[in-house]
UniProtKB/Swiss-Prot annotation:
Subunit structure: P1 and P2 exist as dimers at the large ribosomal subunit.
Gene3D superfamilies per UniProt: 1.10.10.1410
Annotated keywords: Allergen, Phosphoprotein, Ribonucleoprotein, Ribosomal protein
A GO-annotated cellular component: cytosolic large ribosomal subunit
Statement: the UniProt record of this protein carries the keyword Repeat: no
Biased composition (Low complexity): 72-88
Family statement: Belongs to the eukaryotic ribosomal protein P1/P2 family.
Naturally occurring in which organism (per UniProt): Davidiella tassiana (Mycosphaerella tassiana)
GO biological process, one term: cytoplasmic translational elongation
The name this protein goes by in its record: Large ribosomal subunit protein P2
Keyword match Methyltransferase: no
Region (Disordered): 61-111
Amino acid sequence: MKYLAAFLLLGLAGNSSPSAEDIKTVLSSVGIDADEERLSSLLKELEGKDINELISSGSEKLASVPSGGAGAASAGGAAAAGGAAEAAPEAERAEEEKEESDDDMGFGLFD
């Protein structure tokens, strides 16, 4: 994904045919080492394709993907009263763990 993002960034900046060196320069500017095999594979796949057509094609494909809609079913609705008292501290611990793991707010740019 990071290679594609660098390719598209270069294309949108006016470089209609980014080379492997151009992509490596963009990636190294943010501290990422480029993998030659992946980079050459990407360039082979995108060779001769227009960046704007790729973006519009991708947008059309994303529009057809379902996003959310149905809510998750509640699994603990019929718990006994004694079990509910024990579940509360457990839920607090799970919430605390979740908060700690979301330090990057779910955004892992170029991961």
